[in-house]
């Protein structure tokens, strides 16, 4: 690695769905992991709506969630990520609620990352070809608000104080 390249000691990746981090920051995470960074992957939703297979109906959601977690753990192994947190919120229904921000604040306070990677909460479109999923925007907004002000302000969520 370049001696001037920033490599955090601990980094946290916070994304809505299994597979989101691979499309957005996977290369950075792999590079950082290879350089010795400890990475915590936080996946907010279960990914249980991530199929348009006409043979699947609501009865398959638990099976799909288990498959998505297995796939995410395998992807994280390839990237060099050894710690994964699944919050298991419903896929396709994510909102940047106080409850979600509190869950993320708890995890940030627990691991104390030097860097947090997430999506852009304001990005509705990427170029001319991709309409950003509302779960991505909600996850990014909640992650940003958990980083600041919540994680660093002791009197926000005092029940999380050690």
Stretches with model-predicted labels:
Residues 1-112:
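Active-site rim/loop-helix segments in enzyme catalytic domains that contact anionic ligands
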Residues 1-14, 97-162:
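Metal-dependent de-N-acetylase/amidase catalytic core
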């Amino acid at each position: 690695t370049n001696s001037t390249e920033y490599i955090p000691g601990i980094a946290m990746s916070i994304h809505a769905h299994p597979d989101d981090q691979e499309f957005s920051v996977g290369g950075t995470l792999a590079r950082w992991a290879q350089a010795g960074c400890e990475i915590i992957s936080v996946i907010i939703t279960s990914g249980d709506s991530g199929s348009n297979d006409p043979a699947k109906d609501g009865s398959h959601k638990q099976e799909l969630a288990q498959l998505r977690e297995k796939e995410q753990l395998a992807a994280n192994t390839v990237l060099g990520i050894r710690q994964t947190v699944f919050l298991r919120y419903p896929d396709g229904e994510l909102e940047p609620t106080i409850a979600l921000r509190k869950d993320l604040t708890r995890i940030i306070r627990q691991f104390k990352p030097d860097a947090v990677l997430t999506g852009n909460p304001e990005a509705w479109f990427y170029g001319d070809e991709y309409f950003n999923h509302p779960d991505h925007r909600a996850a990014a907004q909640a992650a940003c608000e958990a980083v600041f002000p919540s994680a660093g302000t002791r009197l926000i969520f005092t029940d999380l104080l050690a």
